[in-house]
């Protein structure tokens, strides 16, 4: 059986100029990055803004195993299948972060015969967007430290600077650092730290900005820290939003690539869903909606994280609301949520599938609270048995949710046709009545509690002393009308990664609340969620190499 990278490298790629002809593109609408990658020009983005949006489908998942459950694979395969049956379809997904690629994932461009290509480029440096975001973030850090060194006219309290540096790697050694050491000419010594690039507020800003002017306004609104009198200091006080936007002027343009079957795909932006809002850019999704009859997009991790944030944070910024939600389930993840140990997930266990179904059922119920119709996609693995699949089908029928087996990893577009037809039937016969979970005018505590009780099913929310102090500061500064972005483990509905399935009788503890005014939300930190991940004992990087002819090896 071929690996993902072997499949990807066996494909004869089409020139990207040919791929987008079906969308009505001219050569001048693209800024080429070689033969197979391009960015869309601002002129083309502007030209399609008056087009009526097509149908929007969000792909999400149940609580995953550490390897993930194949949301991107299903997203890509479903789009290929829709195109196969004559529906003009585009994809809008996130671009991978190099940290997890070198760490546990080994790649994040789909899998098998449902991939976006060229996968090696997408997984590595792509068009340089991640580096631009990293540079903009760290330029701001340098400008802050220079301001301190040059006399600190704004009266910034260096003990209360909340802006951190970033790097697009998993590097636990950089979580806490001290800068400015050595001598007075090296700046003002202070504690600092590094986050991973995809946790940067600038990543979230890039993914929520609708144009360059909106980008600049959002950058200007970033809070970098506080003065000695505890008043906030914004980027606009430093007057550097223009410089930061200049660094990002190419990165804000959506990237165009293709699937194995030639479906055009926007791959743009990549915030994590456990520490940020977990969705690709508004600009890419909005443009896809105006170019295609169907746009298939995804949100990170399980529906309790990525989908909730898509529906409560991203969707209000789009030209249309979702017409359907596809929840990806795997037999192995159901068994894990049913209590099976990781090393036994490949063994048949019908009873564990039944027990783990409570996790899927809760996600279905949660998505229905938004008024959007739901379809379940079973992402098929070769270890799944007929009895396990049959039980899952029956359980889905019992809660009246359409379900289809998708074998897109093994069979490409053909393996997604049943899912595509069921999705179309669901959309045509069940119009969406989308509504947000909560009103932004509720208090911070009420919004957090609404998410915790309605989505996670917590008994109550406990706000630690630091969080309570921060809420008072948020209210004082008039920031309390923003939506909430929960930072929580992806493995559980709770804030305990070991509490699997559909737990009840637990509390959610909020340890910190961080205003991200540029992004336009408040991050509520729970548990031990890290904004700078570490590498596993045996990182995927150990299996990576490059051949003498430049061919990438070991990505998967």
From Swiss-Prot:
Record GO terms (molecular function): ATP binding; formate-tetrahydrofolate ligase activity
Family in the record: Belongs to the formate--tetrahydrofolate ligase family.
Record's keyword annotation contains Nucleotide-binding: yes
Gene this protein is translated from: fhs
Organism from which the protein derives: Streptococcus mutans serotype c (strain ATCC 700610 / UA159)
UniProt keyword annotation of Nucleotide-binding present: yes
Descriptive protein name: Formate--tetrahydrofolate ligase
SUPFAM superfamilies: P-loop containing nucleoside triphosphate hydrolases
Biochemical pathway: One-carbon metabolism; tetrahydrofolate interconversion
Keywords for the protein's UniProt record, in alphabetical order: ATP-binding, Ligase, Nucleotide-binding, One-carbon metabolism
Superkingdom classification of source: Bacteria
Catalytically driven reaction(s): (6S)-5,6,7,8-tetrahydrofolate + formate + ATP = (6R)-10-formyltetrahydrofolate + ADP + phosphate
GO BP terms: tetrahydrofolate interconversion
InterPro entries the UniProt entry points to: Formate_THF_ligase, Formate_THF_ligase_CS, P-loop_NTPase
Signal peptide extent: none
Amino-acid positions noted as binding ATP in the UniProt annotation, renumbered to this chain: 65-72
EC number: 6.3.4.3
């Amino acid at each position: 059986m071929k690996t993902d990278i072997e499949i990807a490298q066996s494909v004869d790629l089409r020139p990207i100029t040919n791929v987008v002809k079906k969308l009505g593109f001219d050569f001048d609408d693209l800024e080429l990055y070689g033969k197979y990658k391009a960015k869309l020009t601002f002129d083309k983005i502007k030209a399609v803004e008056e087009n009526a949006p097509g149908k929007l489908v969000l792909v999400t998942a149940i609580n995953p195993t550490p390897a993930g459950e194949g949301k991107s694979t299903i997203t890509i395969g479903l789009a290929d299948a829709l195109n196969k049956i004559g529906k003009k379809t585009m994809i809008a997904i996130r671009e991978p972060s190099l940290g997890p690629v070198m760490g546990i994932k080994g790649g994040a461009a789909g899998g098998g015969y449902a991939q976006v290509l060229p996968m090696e480029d997408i997984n590595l440096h792509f068009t340089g967007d991640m580096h631009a975001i990293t540079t903009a973030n760290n330029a701001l850090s340098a400008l802050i430290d220079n301001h301190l060194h040059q006399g600190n006219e704004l009266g910034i309290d260096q003990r209360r600077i909340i802006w951190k540096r970033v790097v697009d790697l998993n590097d636990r050694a950089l979580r806490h650092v001290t800068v400015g050491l050595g001598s007075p000419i090296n700046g003002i010594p202070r504690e600092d730290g590094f986050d991973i690039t995809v946790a940067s507020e600038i990543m979230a800003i890039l993914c929520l900005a609708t144009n360059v002017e909106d980008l600049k306004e959002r950058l200007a609104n970033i809070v970098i820290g506080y003065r000695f009198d505890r008043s906030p200091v914004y980027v606009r006080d430093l007057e550097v939003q223009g410089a930061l936007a200049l660094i990002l002027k190419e990165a804000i343009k959506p990237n165009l690539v293709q699937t194995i079957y030639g479906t055009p795909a926007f791959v743009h932006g990549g915030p994590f869903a456990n520490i940020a809002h977990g969705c690709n850019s508004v600009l890419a999704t909005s443009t896809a909606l105006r170019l295609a009859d169907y746009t298939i997009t995804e949100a990170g991790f399980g529906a309790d994280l990525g989908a909730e944030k898509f529906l409560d944070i991203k969707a209000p910024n789009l030209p249309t609301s979702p017409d359907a939600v596809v929840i990806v389930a795997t037999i192995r993840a159901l068994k894990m949520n049913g209590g099976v140990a990781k090393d036994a997930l490949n063994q048949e266990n019908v009873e564990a599938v039944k027990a783990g179904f409570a996790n899927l059922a809760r996600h279905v119920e949660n998505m229905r609270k938004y008024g959007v119709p739901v379809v379940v996609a079973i992402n098929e693995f070769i270890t799944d048995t007929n009895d396990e699949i049959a039980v899952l089908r029956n359980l889905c029928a019992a809660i009246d949710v359409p379900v289809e087996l998708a074998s897109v990893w093994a069979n490409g577009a053909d393996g997604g046709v049943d899912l595509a037809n069921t999705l179309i039937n669901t959309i045509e016969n069940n119009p969406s009545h989308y509504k947000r979970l909560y009103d932004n005018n509720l208090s911070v505590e009420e919004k957090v509690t609404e998410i915790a009780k309605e989505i996670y099913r917590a008994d109550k929310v406990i706000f630690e002393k630091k969080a309570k102090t921060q809420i008072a500061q948020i209210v004082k500064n008039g920031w309390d009308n923003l939506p909430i972005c929960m930072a929580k483990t992806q493995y559980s509905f709770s804030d305990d990664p070991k509490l699997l399935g559909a737990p009840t009788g637990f509390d959610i503890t909020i340890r910190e609340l961080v205003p991200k005014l540029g992004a336009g939300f408040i991050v509520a930190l729970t548990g031990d969620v890290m904004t700078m991940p570490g590498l596993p004992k045996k990182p995927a990087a150990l299996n990576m190499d490059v051949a003498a002819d430049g061919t990438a090896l070991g990505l998967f």
